């Protein structure tokens, strides 16, 4: 409240006004940063200051923070938020009198972002597929509510497995491949990964390897499985 020159009650009123009926598809991610750029400023400062502190303590470490802008659906909104991030980061680095490289990329978790990946890739250093939300957005059902009907889908052989546990390679996977095929020609240095529970599923890891992803991330307890699956995928289908 003091930082914004507002009363505590005014801050509480703002928080109350942000209540939504469908927050999954509402005012979140980079939409918040467009409406309240000070949030992006605050978060960027935190990332860069932390990186600078680590760099000072460990000058022998290779450090290059990656700032990921979430929920992009339109290149223009990404560019608006990226401008805030870059200006803030550069100012913090200049004030500290240090040299620090950093990257700014985006989470790809909305189908439209996959369809327009060639535009987004022009200004993004990396893509990270958020397949939990990308699955929700593609199928049009919520991961939190799908349990009410998924068993009936299994019984009727509509689904063979939970699409939130095992990547839907036909639909969601096709969008991912499309995004890579559109993005890399305009940005050959674009590195691409996946985050979400799919990153620990062996068949999903193999699919990610086959379409050209650079890495997968997952929950800590899934890491051994993911590493083994990645090694097996490379043996089965070696990259040049």
Regions found by a protein language model. Give the residues of each.
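Conserved alpha/beta-domain cores
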Residues: 1-240
């Amino acid at each position: 409240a003091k930082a914004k020159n507002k009363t505590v009650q005014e801050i509480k009123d703002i928080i109350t006004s942000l209540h939504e009926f469908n927050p999954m598809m509402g005012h979140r991610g980079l939409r918040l940063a467009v409406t309240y750029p000070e949030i992006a400023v605050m978060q960027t400062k935190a990332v860069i200051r932390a990186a600078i502190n680590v760099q000072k303590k460990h000058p022998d470490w290779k450090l290059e923070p990656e700032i990921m802008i979430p929920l992009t659906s339109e290149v223009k909104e990404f560019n608006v938020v990226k401008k805030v991030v870059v200006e803030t980061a550069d100012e913090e680095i200049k004030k500290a009198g240090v040299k620090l490289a950093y990257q700014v990329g985006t989470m790809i978790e909305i189908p439209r972002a996959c369809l327009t990946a060639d535009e987004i890739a022009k200004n993004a250093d990396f893509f990270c597929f958020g397949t939990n939300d990308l699955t929700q957005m593609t199928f049009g059902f919520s991961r939190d509510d799908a349990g009410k009907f998924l068993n009936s889908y299994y019984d009727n052989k509509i689904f063979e497995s939970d699409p939130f546990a095992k990547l839907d390679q036909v639909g969601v996977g096709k969008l991912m491949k499309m995004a890579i095929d559109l993005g890399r020609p305009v940005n050959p240095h674009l590195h691409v990964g996946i985050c979400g529970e799919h990153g620990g599923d062996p068949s999903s890891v193999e699919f990610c390897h086959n379409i050209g992803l650079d890495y997968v991330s997952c929950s800590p307890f899934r890491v051994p499985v993911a590493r083994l699956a990645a090694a097996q995928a490379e043996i089965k289908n070696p990259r040049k």
